[in-house]
Amino acid sequence: MSCPRLLPTALAIALFAACGFDPGDESPMTPPAVYREWWERTEACSGLAGDFARVRWSVVAGPSFPCASGRCAGHWEPGHRIYLAESWAMNEMVVRHEMLHDLLNRSGHPDVPFGTPCTLTWATWQGDRAPLPAALTHGMPDM
């Protein structure tokens, strides 16, 4: 196979990678006042500090949205972008989980601080365990 034949495939891959994350039906969102309180709690448990005002928030219609790991309730992107599924936009654990990604400025879920001391995973969360929206009864979405 010659290099010119590979060029269209390589360009398509590069273009797809350059497009970044796109959850679909999202809208910019003004964070509710309680988010500042949650941000402060997340700073306190993690020992990290950040600028709440730099975060750009988006809400995605529905109970979850497509992401690299399957279906997500929330997702953080570099550049201080947080996407939240509409059904989870007022769920403290989901929102704070994404806030913690922003404070860390990275993806991934190291046990410290996600598992301890912040307890911001499905397995470790000790706060409100409200019933899942009906669309999620087949399993929890990723964050």
Q: Which residues make up each language-model segment?
A:
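Bacterial N-terminal signal peptides that target proteins for export
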Residues: 1-8
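C-terminal motif of bacterial Sec signal peptides marking the signal peptidase cleavage site
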Residues: 16-18
